A protein has these predicted regions:
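N-terminal glycine-rich anion-binding loops that anchor highly charged ligand groups
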Residues: 17-21
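Acidic/polar, glycine-anchored loop/turn motif associated with catalytic or activation segments
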Residues: 450
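Alpha-helical heptad-repeat coiled-coil segments that mediate oligomerization/polymerization in large
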Residues: 8, 12-15, 30-41, 429, ...
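Small/polar low-complexity and glycine-rich loop motifs
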Residues: 2, 35, 39-439, 446
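N-terminal membrane-targeting segments
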Residues: 462-466
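Generic N-terminal amphipathic, Lys/Arg-enriched alpha-helix
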Residues: 1-8
Length: 469
């Protein structure tokens, strides 16, 4: 009877543990990134009343006689199933769809979590606003003017420096893709202003110097009266400026005498054939271009406050790309249809400020600058474990690496089984209330049954005590 008492006590104690876990699950039903717990029971040791006997020629075998001495908690598991995603529309809210944990830095310690309600602090760091833990990843580095993210490097704090500057870049390449009407009238000798205007097609586009100054590139095209399928082009920079910019124009390493004129020749199919100048320079490559040089206005160049000497280059050279020989797309053409103006690309830009940012499914943070540039600022890292169930809970919906979880495998999204990141959403708790209420009923009945075992054993002891009377 004493055995049944202690068995009943173990039932009470361990069903209370299960009830504690259920209560914690229910209380965290709306906790972002929470992972529910689950209690598994196992029986305790058993007392051997009689051992087993081997069968022989005369009798069969005898099974052992054992009395169980109660039960205990086998495991308290953390169930890392996917929680449902809730859209928030907040760009710093991140959810993981699939495997992985966000990596935080709390002092010298690494923490891991599925809760992605992030924000920016005063320094522009991406943090968990509730505790200041900094989100880890890889910050972009500028190499030759391009933003590069090295995901093989050590992870670091992620910064989104809203308001920071994107330095200006001078134009070095301009790409034309306009059509010149084959039926454009020739400009006769002694032409009037109206005839000159009717026989000229003009393309204008903004280009930039190294200081972010804006200049107007203008190219005037007129048909060559001496040669069919040829156009004479005149390139100028800031043609309406009070101080004309001295220019130089080179075709095939031969400079035009006037520094601005070149000849474009088309084939009978309306596509580019060659570019040349009157001095004999010619470009017959697959991609045709001329090189143009202009003086940067003195007002655009900063000067040394002591010596007054300019602190930057005073001339600038860029390539004016006309297109590919024989190509119809992204190249200049000559067809009997209306002339069109299209400079489809140039690689310069003025200085800009970081105005906004966005985070994509790869965790890459892209900055949107006022000058129209989009640059990578960094990438959020994810961590996976061989045994995520072995992680220790660290409070504040975080986990800590343990000796049984394995070492964190930190990498970029989508690599080695890592999930993807959903921006503007949060992962909700994976607690199912219907399941928890069912477990609560079962646990309550188990607790009641264990208490009834104690009551019945007590009544039996009372009966034994009354035998003496």
């Amino acid at each position: 009877m004493m055995r049944s008492l202690y068995s009943g006590v173990s039932g009470l104690q361990n069903h209370q543990v299960r009830m504690d876990v259920i209560g914690n699950n229910i209380s965290n039903v709306n906790t972002t990134g929470f992972k529910r717990g689950r209690v598994n029971f196992q029986d305790l040791i058993s007392q051997m009343m009689q051992g087993p006997a081997r069968p022989n020629e005369r009798v069969g075998g005898v099974n052992p006689k054992q009395i169980g001495l109660g039960m205990t908690v086998a495991t308290i598991d953390t169930i890392h199933t996917q929680g449902s995603l809730q859209t928030t529309g907040i760009k710093t809210d991140l959810a993981i769809q699939g495997n992985g944990f966000f990596v935080f830095r709390a002092g010298d310690q690494q923490m891991f979590s599925r809760a992605g309600a992030f924000g920016l602090d005063e320094e522009g760091m991406l943090v968990n606003p509730s505790n200041g833990m900094r989100v880890q990843g890889w910050q972009a580095r500028s190499i030759d003017g391009e933003s590069v993210i090295n995901t093989s490097a050590q992870i670091e704090d992620l910064m989104i420096p809203v308001g920071s500057k994107d330095p200006a870049k001078e134009t070095s390449q301009v790409y034309l893709a306009c059509n010149l009407n084959k039926n454009t009238p020739l400009i006769p000798a002694g032409a009037t202003a109206a005839q000159i205007q009717e026989g000229t097609w003009t393309t204008e586009y903004d280009i930039y110097d190294a200081f972010g100054g804006t200049h107007t590139l203008r190219v005037d095209f007129v048909r060559n009266p001496d040669q069919e399928n040829q156009w004479i082009a005149t390139a100028t920079v800031d043609p309406n400026a009070e101080e004309a910019l001295v220019q130089g124009l080179t075709v095939g390493d031969v400079e035009s005498a006037d520094g601005r004129t070149f000849i474009v020749e088309y084939g009978n199919d309306g596509t580019l054939r060659s570019v040349q100048n009157a001095e004999g320079g010619q470009d017959n490559a697959d991609v045709l271009a001329v090189s143009l040089t202009f003086d940067v206005p003195r007002t655009s160049i900063p000067v040394d406050p002591v010596t007054g000497a300019p602190l930057g280059q005073q001339t600038q050279t860029f390539d004016l790309n006309l297109g590919e020989v024989g190509a119809f797309i992204d190249s200049m053409t000559q067809f009997a249809s209306e002339s069109s103006t299209k400079v489809f690309s140039q690689n310069g830009f003025p200085m800009g400020y970081l105005e906004d940012f966005r985070i994509d499914q790869s965790g890459t943070i892209t900055g949107v600058f006022s000058n129209g540039n989009n640059r990578s600022l960094g990438q959020v890292a994810l961590a996976t474990f061989r045994n995520p169930g072995g992680l220790e809970k660290g409070g504040e919906t975080t986990f800590v690496e343990s000796i049984n979880s394995g070492i964190a495998d930190i990498g970029s999204v989508g690599v080695a089984g890592k999930g993807k990141i959903i921006a503007g959403a949060l992962e909700m708790s994976n607690v199912d209330l219907a399941e928890q209420f069912t477990d609560m009923i079962v646990t309550q009945r188990g607790f009641q049954a264990s208490s009834r075992t104690i009551q019945t054993s007590d009544q039996m002891l009372q009966e034994v005590l009354t035998l003496k009377r």
